[in-house]
């Protein structure tokens, strides 16, 4: 779990810190951080990956305000399951699994055609998980427990 946090969170933090002065001096630009829907809320089989992505989303939200003063956009990309060698190793169902080409198209269009803070896809999955975020823990934990046992 520490390795995952070091790579996903601290690696991204170090990259942003490395370009921070450049963007602020330029007073223009766009920083996009790749998170995941796994960071929306605690999920089974995700005790390392999920928290690292939750930290990235929180980081993106925080620096949004810091960079906005310098006319630098910040966005966060929250993809669902994308077919990669890493997801090929998963031993659980991955609803709405998409191709890397699908993901690239969604990210590109989101960055070019939108001023949205978050680019998330596929909507069938992301909107469901966003709804789960507003539920009280008692209901959320009950529902996820039932869904996982199916």
Which sequence ranges carry the predicted segments?
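Active-site Tyr-X3-Lys motif and surrounding loop/helix of classical short-chain dehydrogenase/reductase
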Residues: 2-6
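Active-site helix of classical SDR
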Residues: 16, 52
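A short helix-coil junction within the Rossmann-fold of NAD(P)-dependent oxidoreductases
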Residues: 18-27
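Alpha-helical segment proximal to the catalytic Tyr-Lys
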Residues: 21, 65-69
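Residue(s) in the substrate-gating loop at a strand-loop-helix junction
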Residues: 36
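Active-site loop immediately N-terminal to the catalytic Tyr-X3-Lys motif
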Residues: 43-47
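C-terminal helical subdomain
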Residues: 76, 92-128
């Amino acid at each position: 779990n520490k390795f995952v946090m070091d790579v996903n969170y601290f690696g991204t933090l170090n990259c942003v810190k490395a370009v921070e002065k450049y963007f602020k001096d330029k007073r223009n630009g766009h920083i996009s951080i790749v998170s995941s829907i796994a960071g929306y809320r605690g999920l089974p089989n995700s005790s390392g990956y999920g928290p690292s992505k939750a930290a990235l989303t929180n980081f993106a939200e925080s620096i949004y305000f810091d960079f906005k003063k310098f006319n630098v956009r910040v966005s966060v990309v929250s993809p669902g399951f994308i077919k990669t060698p890493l997801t090929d190793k998963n031993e659980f169902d991955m609803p709405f699994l998409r191709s890397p080409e699908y993901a690239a198209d969604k990210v590109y269009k989101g960055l070019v055609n939108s001023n949205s803070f978050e680019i998330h896809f596929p909507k069938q999955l992301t909107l469901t998980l966003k709804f789960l975020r507003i539920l009280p823990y008692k209901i959320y934990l009950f529902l996820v427990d039932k869904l996982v046992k199916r």
